[in-house]
Regions:
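Intrinsically disordered, low-complexity linker/terminal regions across diverse proteins
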Residues: 42, 48, 77-81, 92, ...
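Noncatalytic, helix-rich "gating/capping" subdomain that lines the substrate-entry/channel surface
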Residues: 1-200, 237
């Protein structure tokens, strides 16, 4: 966090934030002195929150954040806010338990939310509301409201009005835009081909698990059982969310429409309390170039937009290239079922430790090897936090290995094309500031390191490119990290 005393850009960023906030508040009609007071107050209150908030590293280990607290204990622990009334007013009843993700905030809540801090809290709420509203007002305010994020990421100019209009539409109707994209640009033939690759990748994983040498048989059998139960979604969902039926577009201002839509979303969110979970619901629109594994449903999802070059092409890329692209991504998402977080969920998506103690200790030892391999690597004028990126690195390692195994089964395999495609999908164009920001918060390693470090764990890479000891990408056999 840039509130930390040792953050190299602390003064630069916070001073800029205050000045930018004063400009925004002034445009809303606040006098300079009052605007400055509010801006300084929000920084003071943010600094208080930063002392207790989870770190990026803690958020990365999300399975460890599950901390259920009985409702009686929860209410008694937080005395400065009448949470019994608040929760009952929202849900209509009190739940049995509350899941506390931020233990330090919970333990220090009364020291944060109290009468002494009330003026800071009021400024914090006011400024947050005003800054968030700038996206929906004049174009000058939109540009002014995004100045701080551009400063943080090193972006030279605001998004164009055209792109902003697209952002507004997709923010409110993401699944509708995704469904249009899927129907327009994604074909059944490509879907069938990717489904075939996914089936092959799961089969490879099952075989590799069956031959695993560091797990006991009971754990191997349960891991294979989890693979057998995995659900795969490809392309786009079959239906739109029902909530869209409650969205009515009128000639109100954009701000009023968004505010009304947010109320609808909030009501729908809390109405889901104690309802059965819809495991067919997509949490990512089809036009997004991404993919994900959902641990609480044991589901992997590949939106239509990622099923294009350089990840995949049915007609313009070879099978080896496709395995190095989308194949590795598919296997990466499968691997998340067995990373340091996903491994704590069973085949039904329930948090349930299905490992023997001895097996999990062996797994943790392998995690430490992956942490050490990346920790402290220099890039973009900063260093990698190995603990922050370990889950994604485990998935990358397992995914690349499984995809290569599948590619080798093809009669026309070309490992040079396979590895080259893997490198191509991680190309990135970004400012140094943006890369440094990601290093502090993103659970993924930088693209260049994802491309180059992971391949150096595979013996086949050295054979394919004739890499010898003394070459830049050489890694001795004893230092090559292999997990799945």
């Amino acid at each position: 966090t840039y509130y930390a005393e040792d953050h190299p850009r602390k003064s630069e960023l916070l001073d800029f934030y205050v000045a930018n906030t004063v400009k925004i508040l002034s445009d809303f009609g606040y006098e300079q002195a009052i605007a400055l007071n509010h801006a300084e107050n929000i920084v003071k209150f943010d600094a208080i929150l930063a002392q207790y908030a989870n770190t990026s590293e803690e958020w990365a280990k999300y399975a460890e954040l599950y901390n259920p607290v009985p409702i009686k204990a929860f209410i008694e622990a937080l005395t400065t806010v009448p949470f019994a009334d608040v929760i009952e007013g929202i849900l209509g009843k009190l739940p049995d338990k509350v899941i506390v993700y931020e233990k330090r905030v919970y333990a220090n809540f009364d020291a944060i939310m109290n009468e002494a801090n009330f003026e800071l809290i009021k400024s914090w709420m006011l400024v947050k509301l005003i800054r968030s509203s700038t996206h929906y007002l004049s174009d000058d305010l939109r540009i002014l409201g995004s100045e701080f994020s551009r400063k943080l990421s090193g972006t030279s100019e605001a998004r164009s009005q055209e792109k902003h209009a697209f952002d507004l539409a997709t923010d409110q109707y993401s699944q509708a835009v995704g469904l249009y994209y899927g129907h327009t640009y994604f074909g059944e033939s490509a879907k069938a081909d990717v489904k075939r690759m996914t089936t092959e990748m799961i089969k490879v994983y099952q075989e590799r698990l069956d031959k695993n040498t560091w797990l006991s048989r009971p754990t191997i059998d349960k891991a294979i059982k989890k693979l057998d139960a995995m659900t795969v979604f490809i392309g786009f969902p079959d239906k739109l969310p029902d909530i869209y039926k409650q969205f009515t577009v009128t000639h109100e201002s954009i701000y009023s429409l968004v505010a009304r839509f947010n109320v609808v979303r909030s009501h729908r969110h809390y109405a889901k309390f104690n309802e059965p979970v819809d495991k067919t619901e997509w949490h990512m629109p089809a036009h997004m170039v991404n993919a994900y594994f959902s641990p609480d449903s044991n589901t992997i999802v590949f939106p239509a937009a990622i099923l294009q070059k350089p990840f995949y092409s049915e007609t313009e890329q070879t099978k080896s290239q496709n395995y190095g692209g989308i194949g590795a991504v598919i296997a990466h998402e499968i691997s998340h079922a067995f990373d340091n977080n996903g491994a704590l969920f069973d085949e039904f998506g329930n948090m349930n430790n299905w490992w023997t103690d001895e097996d999990f200790k062996a797994f943790e030892a392998k995690q430490e090897l992956m942490i050490a391999e990346f920790d402290g690597l220099d890039i973009a004028g900063a260093k990698v936090n190995g603990k922050l990126v370990v889950s994604e690195n485990i998935a990358d390692a397992g995914g690349l290995t499984a995809a290569m195994t599948a590619a080798l089964r093809e009669t026309d395999v070309d490992l040079k094309a396979f590895f080259t495609q893997w490198g191509e999908i991680w190309r990135i164009k970004a400012s140094q500031e943006y890369q440094q920001m990601l290093l502090s918060m993103d659970v993924h390693a930088p693209g260049k390191l994802r491309a180059n470090i992971q391949v150096s764990n595979l013996d086949e890479f050295f054979d394919t490119f004739d890499v010898k000891e003394g070459d830049g990408m050489w890694r001795s056999e004893t230092d090559r990290v292999k997990i799945w």
